Amino acid sequence: MFNPMTPPQVNSYSEPCCLRPLHSQGVPSMGTEGLSGLPFCHQANFMSGSQGYGAARETSSCTEGSLFPPPPPPRSSVKLTKKRALSISPLSDASLDLQTVIRTSPSSLVAFINSRCTSPGGSYGHLSIGTMSPSLGFPPQMSHQKGTSPPYGVQPCVPHDSTRGSMMLHPQSRGPRATCQLKSELDMMVGKCPEDPLEGDMSSPNSTGTQDHLLGMLDGREDLEREEKPEPESVYETDCRWDGCSQEFDSQEQLVHHINSEHIHGERKEFVCHWGGCSRELRPFKAQYMLVVHMRRHTGEKPHKCTFEGCRKSYSRLENLKTHLRSHTGEKPYMCEQEGCSKAFSNASDRAKHQNRTHSNEKPYVCKLPGCTKRYTDPSSLRKHVKTVHGPDAHVTKRHRGDGPLPRAQPLSTVEPKREREGGSGREESRLTVPESAMPQQSPGAQSSCSSDHSPAGSAANTDSGVEMAGNAGGSTEDLSSLDEGPCVSATGLSTLRRLENLRLDQLHQLRPIGSRGLKLPSLTHAGAPVSRRLGPPVSLDRRSSSSSSMSSAYTVSRRSSLASPFPPGTPPENGASSLPGLTPAQHYMLRARYASARGSGTPPTAAHSLDRMGGLSVPPWRSRTEYPGYNPNAGVTRRASDPARAADHPAPARVQRFKSLGCVHTPPSVATGRNFDPHHPTSVYSPQPPSITENVAMDTRGLQEEPEVGTSVMGNGLNPYMDFSSTDTLGYGGPEGTAAEPYEARGPGSLPLGPGPPTNYGPGHCAQQVSYPDPTPENWGEFPSHAGVYPSNKAPGAAYSQCPRLEHYGQVQVKPEQGCPVGSDSTGLAPCLNAHPSEGSPGPQPLFSHHPQLPQPQYPQSGPYPQPPHGYLSTEPRLGLNFNPSSSHSTGQLKAQLVCNYVQSQQELLWEGRNRGGLPNQELPYQSPKFLGGSQVSQSPAKTPAAAAAAYGSGFAPASANHKSGSYPAPSPCHETFTVGVNRPSHRPAAPPRLLPPLSPCYGPLKVGDTNPSCGHPEVGRLGAGPALYPPPEGQVCNALDSLDLDNTQLDFVAILDEAQGLSPPLSHEQGDSSKNTPSPSGPPNMAVGNMSVLLGSLPGETQFLNSSA
């Protein structure tokens, strides 16, 4: 971007924009094209430190119309290649001290830069303006390009006006306005004359240690201006101008010898300079050496030369040479005296400037010229200001420097905008201040030469350049005018532009008041809404995006943990009601428990005291792993948990589901957090360890009185993305009345019961009352829907299937083998009513997930007493914890074998236990005949050894009774046996200590169904199989002794399970972290009765062994 003040191109010559690598170019040709036809380079080519100063392509300027004599013959331009590249870029870290890097280098480029000033005349010490550099053979204005280098190795060239001379690049502002400031330095714009002497100023005007903190991009500028600027040839004097002396000499050395011997030493009484036009105006010096040094200003003598190889620097004062030598050695003996500041400087004057600018902001050096109110921190900046702004004719004296009483500078925040610009008589109309848009903005505290707007480091504004910039509260734009002046335009246009620019700077300064020097950052706020408000739509929490980034990545890394805790990494809110008003205290506890487990602490918060007093809604169990199809971690299904209710693709065949067919095991509806009551176990829904029974017992006993309200979404407010599954929808079948899947309701991970556990989340149309069903006699068989797979009881119509259970026996689980296996499994692998006749030809509804192939229904002989089995036996939809892989490719024979194993085990274990403690009335238990399973003969005597039984079904059902803790068991009884519900375990786990099963005796009797609820209270109990309705066998049908059993109220005593079977099963594997039941497992070796039913008999040999042993 060009300087907006640059006038349009007026010449016809233009060079097409080109890209030329700089490192292969060297110095531009100075041939017949002249110095005016060279294209200028884009600013970006000068911003890299990798090429160093030497790689900078220096463009030439027009020497036509120069007011000064032509330069001496140029020295070899090979010197450019000797310059050492900087190891850093101006874009480097804001706190980097570029001067330190330069000075500490053994072959510092500063020495080479300083060697430019070898001309003896017209120099104010080290400063000279506008003269040709004798070291490089380029006009003096080109020397300012030495501090830049191309970063990209290319040089985009643009048309260049040959009449304006060299287009000089202003170092890019690193503020928001990163524009390329192009400037043209013309010799006619720069006044040249011998510099005014400052004999009393013992500070080092040539000091190279100055840091330009304010102008971060101008970091080598002060060195360049102080030591590198070539002195004009006019300063090289050979004629004596002493009053009354007009001798002429052939060399400068002769002139110097003449002055020292004839004029200085000849007048020993007073030390006064009588040089014609001397600005001291005959003011005497205090010592003779001061006069000698002063005369070097007139003669241009620089006797002190740098001794480093390749360095041609020379100085008129010894202290300046010493300071320069520190640039080679890297010595910085002058440490900042401010406490906490570790900056070091090579000379005391630089340290004083730093301390004034950075720490105290004192500006004792005030320009005393009429109409100028500029103030500076050091005399060198004042001298530079006077020369560049007021012209070479302006005299800088002690009075101008402010050597008298030093006025205290106003604080930075109270500095009034001083906007008087070049309007004085001594100011040249050609002087143009650098526009603020091209100025680097004040760094918010960085104390580095590479400061920028965006640098957050540091705590104070930086004005080490001594330049008070408009809008930046320090320095002056005039100080940079000799380096940054605009292109050559007419005097009238230049004045207009200058006035406009000054007016603009004034306005900006007024609109942008100077604040405190420290960096003020806004207080950090959480991205998005508060945590309690982020729990919005399901997808919003599932994916790790910027909108939900408040959750710790420690527990959002898992792709399966789409329901990672909504709490921030800190402690979850104890007062949940304030943050999540839509939740009950129990629900808040549940969230806190999930959060504690997700963090891996393993210690959820203790249950809130309000749980004991709370009524209201039940919370769905959070232990489900496969409450929606396609999410079955053990089945190899690759899906993201954040995709709700997505049916899974066809994975590899998984293990056959080992559902037990022992009836629906009813656990009382849990209170909001009843599933994890033990504070020593993980409570996250995706915790590697399932909950223990101990955690659940206490809350189960409480939860019997808290039943969910009809149609209530328990976890409202979008807390659970998967709470919107209805029981029918998760099962994939219609409702009991033949309706389609119900709309989503409060269902979450675990809303379906785990294994033989009850679902505590009920959708519309479900109640919490214990329901009963009419006697399934042949008269009313047709009353039940064809897809109902569970016997209804004799006290209610079949429409009550959607009701939820209400149990009366606290702490125990009721078992009804006639209702199939526990609910919570995915449709189907459960055998509803194991002793019933399916409706012949009744196909049953197909699963809603049409892309899951349905296994063909085996056709059984219809002549037998037990016709075709329900379709539910062959369904492949997975369900909670049962890990029956959808799209399973197991054959029908394997499924039959599975059913045989399940039912035989359940019936044998039912007979093993003693009478129920509750003394429930005896009722006969339906039994599934082997004929129903396709003719498979099941031994009615458990002749198989315990080892065989253990090998057949892994951990199997371990009978346990609360009344028999010593390991002895009573004789089998045909009714209401209390036993523990075994859960399938991985086949690789060691077999638990077996318990012999008693023999079974034949019995005769009709089927009678008790008053229990269907299938653990799940509204889909009975239609899990989605197959035809099952009916009891004809009256008088001779069947196994199990037919006479009435397990209507057979219950599971969790206390007995907890006491006896605590250490019978090994820990779950990580992949099977969630139990198939909603009964928690202990933190140690999980209870055999609480294992994962999803992986029992994962190997086919185990099934075969059991079938062979039971045949």
Swiss-Prot record:
InterPro entries documented for this protein: GLI-like (IPR043359), Znf-C2H2_ZIC1-5/GLI1-3-like (IPR056436), Znf_C2H2_sf (IPR036236), Znf_C2H2_type (IPR013087)
Residues modified to N6-acetyllysine: 520
Compositional bias of kind Basic and acidic residues: 416-431, 640-649
C2H2-type zinc finger locations on the chain: 238-263, 271-298, 304-328, 334-359, 365-390
Keywords, comma-separated and alphabetical: Acetylation, Activator, Cytoplasm, Developmental protein, Differentiation, DNA-binding, Isopeptide bond, Metal-binding, Nucleus, Phosphoprotein, Proto-oncogene, Repeat, Transcription, Transcription regulation, Ubl conjugation, Zinc, Zinc-finger
Cross-link (Glycyl lysine isopeptide (Lys-Gly) (interchain with G-Cter in SUMO2)): 1008
Stretch list, region Disordered: 52-78, 378-487, 528-583, 598-649, 673-692, 832-891, 1064-1093
GO cellular component: axoneme; ciliary basal body; cilium; cytoplasm; GLI-SUFU complex; nucleoplasm; nucleus; plasma membrane
Compositional bias ranges of the Pro residues kind: 855-870
One of the record's GO molecular function terms: sequence-specific DNA binding
Self-association state and partner proteins as the record states: Interacts with KIF7. Interacts with STK36. Interacts with ZIC1; the interaction enhances transcription activation. Interacts with SUFU; this inhibits transcriptional activation by GLI1.
Record protein name field: Zinc finger protein GLI1
Species in which this protein is naturally found: Mus musculus (Mouse)
Record lineage: Eukaryota, Metazoa, Chordata, Craniata, Vertebrata
